[in-house]
From Swiss-Prot:
This is Putative F-box/FBD/LRR-repeat protein At5g44950. LRR repeats lie at residues 246-275, 286-310. Keywords: Leucine-rich repeat, Repeat. Residues 3-49 form the F-box domain. The keyword Lipid metabolism does not apply. InterPro entries: F-box-like_dom_sf, F-box_AtFBL13-like, F-box_dom, FBD, FBL13/AtMIF1-like, LRR_dom_sf, LRR_FXL15/At3g58940/PEG3-like. It comes from Arabidopsis thaliana. It comes from the Eukaryota. The lineage of its organism: Eukaryota, Viridiplantae, Streptophyta, Embryophyta, Tracheophyta.
Length: 438
């Protein structure tokens, strides 16, 4: 009979292993032997979902009480997923969270689901003064402004999603994290946070998603982060967007309309100086970026802005991924003109119902000297604007090394592929360009 080498491991190592098992599997190990009976109660972390337990809540309540009674040491991880409208447990969740925070939790993850606003649980105030928290994720819960100065000296990662904020708490949380490196804020409902200021000397990664359905002019965002390297900015609501000190920015994923709605015609008129200046200052503030992903709604804003103002230069930009419809192709040469050192270009192409006349006479500097790799996705065989787009790069890109084309009506017949290849090879300016059709 083989030796039970697992049971020979020290308790500390076994506890660490049990922490990565599902809670039910961890509990089952208690029947292995008397030594294993209470090992699961001493794991340094717990990942529990109320939905994995009987609906009456008795077993879950008993498990939590026993775990916290036996395990009085410092916890590494505590992840809790629950419904705050479970009336039989509604008074227990917040005290449990407060207890693990008091015991020196390092990684706290709390998600409340299916919670109408009147059942929202406001998190315990001691979260805002934890000396041990390294990462904090809160989803669909409330945050109240504490009566003390927020201080989270070890917090590096913070994720706040669909939070019901009291005034100033978001700004106080961010300013109270002197080593914060990674911040995510997601807002999909109305709250009291009309102004969001992100000021941090240490922040490296920032993601903002704001997609609440009702338009308003009352929302503002201000970002001041001199060490920021990556920003994902997906905001369809904020009217005023201010960025400062982003000279370290390497990559941006941009999807914003500056709260401009074009469905009933463009509200961006020459006399709208305030909105024009907001857009200009934002673009100037991110102009040192090297890698950009930009959405179709944002390009539409820039297209309309380009008719009343000058787009700033992006001298450092070498990689661009953009969503261009055939109606926006008129902007493409002008947009490439502000990227004089562009090396890689990915275009997600789509066909508009009423494409504008395309004028490809302008020859941007990057086509002559730097652009080496172009990929165009979602082309359609025999669609005129798409063919013009492909020929524009082939006929004018002097140093192009590779052009990759993918079609939504693939696979093409051999005859179609041969016809397309003949068209492409006969118009190449760069003799070393390799054309790949997917």
């Amino acid at each position: 009979m083989g030796r039970d080498r697992i049971s020979e491991l020290p308790d500390g190592l076994l506890n660490h292993i049990l922490m990565y098992l599902h809670i039910e599997e961890s509990i089952r190990t208690s029947v292995l032997s008397s030594r294993w009976r209470k090992l699961w109660l001493k794991v340094p972390g717990l990942d529990v979902n109320v939905h994995d337990f009987p609906a009456d809540g008795n077993l879950f309540e008993s498990l939590m009480d026993k775990f916290l009674e036996v395990n009085r040491g410092r916890l590494q991880n505590f992840k809790l997923n629950y419904e705050s409208n479970l009336y039989y447990l509604m008074d227990r969740f917040v005290p449990w969270i407060a207890t693990v925070v008091d015991r020196g939790i390092q990684h706290l993850d709390v998600t409340a689901t299916d919670c109408p606003p009147w059942t929202i649980d406001f998190m315990p105030a001691n979260i805002c003064k934890s000396k041990t928290l390294v990462s904090l994720k809160l989803v669909n819960v409330g945050l109240d402004t504490p009566k003390f100065v927020v201080s989270l000296p070890c917090l590096k990662i913070m994720h706040l999603e669909d939070i019901f904020y009291s005034p100033l708490i978001a700004e106080n949380l961010i300013s109270g994290c002197p080593v914060l490196e990674d911040l995510t804020i997601v807002r999909n409902h109305e709250d009291f946070l009309n102004f969001l200021r992100v000021m941090s000397q240490t922040l490296k990664n920032f993601r903002l998603t704001f997609d609440w359905g009702m338009g308003s002019n009352d929302f503002s965002v201000e970002i001041d982060a001199p060490g920021l390297k990556y920003m994902s900015f997906r905001d369809s609501q904020s009217d005023r967007i201010v960025v400062k000190n982003l000279s370290s920015l390497v990559k941006i994923d941009l999807d914003t309309e500056f709260n401009l709605k074009f469905g009933l015609g463009s509200p961006l008129e020459p006399e709208d100086l305030t909105k024009r200046d907001i857009i200009r200052d934002f673009l100037t503030g991110i102009s040192s970026v090297k890698h950009m992903i930009i959405s179709h709604p944002t390009l539409e804003v820039l297209y309309r802005y380009s008719k009343i103002g000058q787009l700033p230069k992006f001298h450092n930009l070498y990689h661009l991924q953009a969503v261009f419809s055939s109606s926006l192709l008129q902007l493409l040469p002008a947009f490439l003109e502000i990227c004089p050192n562009l090396k890689n270009l990915i275009l997600d192409y789509s066909i508009s119902a009423e494409p504008e006349q395309i004028d490809f006479t302008n020859l941007p500097r990057c086509l002559i000297s730097t652009l080496e790799y172009v990929e165009i996705k979602q082309l359609t065989m025999r669609e005129e604007s798409g063919i013009k787009l492909v020929k524009y790069f082939l006929e004018n890109s002097a140093v192009l090394k590779k052009l990759t084309l993918s079609f939504i009506d693939s696979p093409m017949t051999n005859q179609e592929s041969e016809i397309y290849m003949q068209l492409l090879t006969s118009t190449k300016r760069s003799r070393g360009c390799h054309v790949l059709i997917l």
